[in-house]
Structure formats: C-alpha cells, structure tokens
Amino acid sequence: MKRTQLLPQKNLAQTCAKCHSDAGFLSRHQIPVAHPVESYEQSVHGRAIAAGSGQAANCNNCHGNHDIQPAREAESRVNHWRVSQTCAQCHKEIAKTYEESIHGVAVKSGVKDSPVCTDCHGEHLILGPKNPASPVNAANVSAETCGRCHASARMAKLYDLPADRVPSYADSYHGLALKGGKMTAANCASCHGVHNIFRSADARSTVNTANLGKTCGQCHKGADEARYAIGPIHVQTGAGPNHPVVKWIRWTYWVLIPMTLGFMLLHNLLDLLTKLIRRRPRHESSEVALRMNLQFRIAHWGIMASFPTLVVTGFALKYPDSWWARPLLMWESNAGVRGGLHRVAAIVMLLATAYHFIHLAMKKRDRAFVWAMLPGIKDATDMVHVFAYNLGFTKKEPTFAKFNYAEKMEYWAFMWGTVVMALSGFMLWFNNFSLRHFPKWVSDAATAVHWYEALLATFSILIWHFYLVIFDPMVYPMDTAWLNGKIPADHYRHSRPEYFRTLKRAGLVELPSELSGYEDEQGTAVTSGNDPSGKT
C-alpha cells in the first residue's frame, strides 16, 4: 500500500478537525469516535508531526484520501481485517512478525476476536510504551491489554482459553510487585513476547520448554547457563492444578490457621470474661520482681523492632492498593524501598534470635531458661485446669511453674516460625540460586509457606501475645518488663507461688528502689525465670 500525501503534514489534522471535531457533525452521521483529532494530536504520531517529522503517520495514511470508507466496510484501510496491512506501511518488520504470530494467524483465519494492532496500541491516541497512560506500558499491559481478552469468561469459553492466566499472574510475585510500582517486574510481554507471540508448543515461542531458560534468564541471571528446573509458571492460589506438595501445604494451612486462631480466641475470651467477672485485685503490694535481665531485653527489642516492619513491608507486597501501603510503595519504581526494608528487618530478627542463643550459650546460669521452657505433662493438665476454671467447673484458681503453657507455646511457636520464615524467605530472596538448583515447585512451595506462615504469625501476635502483655486484666494497660525488666511481685505471688518463693529467697522481690541494683549484680541468680520474649 503506497503512502500518499496531498496536504502539508501539519495542516492535514486540522483540515479533518473541521468536521470530526464538530459534535453536531459526529451526531448527525452517527460517528461513534469522540475527539479523534484531539486524541491524535496527543499521540506519538501527532507529536512527531508537530515536531516537524515528515515520516510520521497522518490521518490519510491510515484512512486514505478520497477513498475513505467506514471501518465496517471490507475496503476500509482501518477495517479490522486490514489494520496490520495499514500499519505495515511504516512498521513493516513488526507487521510481518505479528502476522506470523498466534494472533496474526487467527486474524487471517477469520477470528474476529483476535487482536490487531489497534486493540493493543489504541487507534488515534497511540502512546509510547514508556508513557504511563499507554495500554502497552509495563504497568498496564497485563491487566488492561492482555487481560481484556485473557481474563474474559466469554473468550475463555468460546475459544477454550485457560481462564486462570491473568488472575494467577496478578497474584504472583511479578504481578503484585508490578502493581506495587516495581516497573522492572515481569509482565505478560516480558515472557510471552510482544508481537512474536506463539503457542507454547511452538519451538519459536519464548515460553516453549526449550526456551524458558533463556526467557527467564533475562531477569534471573544464570537461569540459561545452568540446569534450569522448569515447572508450572502460572501457579494457582486455590486448589488449582499445582504440584502435589504445594497443594498439600495449602490444605494444611487452611486447616491449621483457623483451628489455631479459633483456639486462641476462645482461650483468651474465656480468660478475659472470668477475670472481669471475678475482679481479683491486681496488686496487693508495691513489691516488684525481676522478670527479664538486660540480655533478654536486648533480644526482645530487636524482635520488637523487626517484626512489625516485616509485617507491614510483607503485606504491602500482597495488598499494594491498601491505603497504608501506598506511602511505602510510592518509592518502589526507583528505589525498591519495600523489599529493602523487608530484608533488613529479616536480618535484624535473625540477629536478635542469634543474640538470644549466644547469650544462653555464654551464661551458664541462664541456660536453665531452656529447660524451664520445655513443655511437659503438667502444661497439658494446667491448660485443662484453666479451661475448667474459666468455664466454672472448678473454683480452685490454677497455679503454674516458672513458665506457664501459654508462654511456652508462644516461645516455641516463635522459634519454629522464625526457622520456617527464614528458610522460605532466603529461598525467595536468592531466587536465582533456588531456580538453578531446585525444581520450580520448591520455589512455589516456599512462596506458599512464607505467605501462610506470615498470616499465622501476624494474627498469633495480635490475638495471643497482645492479650498476654496488654489486654489481660492482670497486666493492663501493659506489661512493662520489656522496658525495665520488672513486674509487680503479685503477678508471681498468686499464679506461681513456688517460683515466687524462689525469687524471695534470692532477694529478687523488693520495693522498686531496692531492686534497682540487682539486675547487674544478681540478675542471673534465678535466670531460669527470665523470659526473653517478654511474654507474661
């Protein structure tokens, strides 16, 4: 198709605008496209013309001169079946590539729903891919452009297309990171190609099994140089066709999380109601007892600073549209603040945990803490006793040893969770290593574990830990042991009488002013009673 030009380039759009910018004209002739000239002038073509380019497309290059036909007519240059030929006047190689692609072949076969150039790039308002308003901008291509067809239930049913591709991508790390502003995250075109899209079974396809290493290697350096273990790319968040291990992990957590949180809510609600109804005085004296020496408090401070940071920065990836996530993600396109903070917080938590164990290893007297934290038969009977007391089956108030079952459960759950989150987190952090040395389902399993364990840990802290150190009527409004290491002696006098007598004999139950010097001089005298997490 030969390009012709009858009027100076800069004047042609304004000539067409005399009619096509007239609302009355558009209405009378039932022309549905509003503001075509204004849109064109803002496009890459219109701006190039305005800048003096003689090569950019003008109205007549696409619509013709005196042979202009409505788009519905087969002879029209902008008819759906002829669009790629019209664009080929300038974009010859791209048009050739497109016509060989799955979309181009489908158009030639008469599939009217198969996209042509204007379906993806627009018609009059064609913008460059770096323009945030462009439908082929990295932020828009998956959800708005590809998603318009591949997320359509009608299209999926009519052409037997997989209906899960767009939602599974949107819920993946790539989709969530892109939605959160990380423009370097992979989108549909990053993997499937732009104009050169083929069926995955086609050897030319960038997502063909033989080519996946090279495709993924664009971002994951080394993936195309080593044994790249290929697996399903679009991983389901529900009970879809995933690897059996990933399915098993999800089903396990779907049962574990509601059961665990339900138990916590029931336990704390019964305890709260019982204490509110019986209203025993919290403090009968002004005596205080040493709860946490400085070493335990340092470890707790590190965990206390890192855990909320991990929660906020982690959930900001999963819920990038949340109001609380936006201030954090506003820097994501350039600096990657969220991910950086998340990893720093993870290191801080691991260092705090390591500090705790180094402290126990170096302080012989404090090592008794570990033995005191081990669960035993008494913890099970204590739990039964607490439920019986809170339900009114017994009037005898339960008493405990140095640590009660609630503190032991939280301590060991924290240690287990830290190990699980660290292992899964490092696999995701060093994803190139993981993808080179393990099957892809291992990374998918790590993603599932990291997500569900984060949910469990977050709600456990909110429900279990916050009740123990804030909302329990016996400590409300806050257990201050994490600040100064001390708690009211009555906390032990009533609920842990044997341990209270041990503290008393050691001289660690005194008036506040008298106890101030004990932390450094005698703080380890009965450290089997110290609690590194501040969970009281």
Question: What does each of the following model-derived ranges do?
Answer:
Residues M1-R291, W324, L329-N334, H356-R367:
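Short sequence/structural segments immediately N-terminal
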Residues L212-Q218, G222-T536:
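Membrane-embedded alpha-helical bundles that constitute the cytochrome b-like, heme-associated redox core
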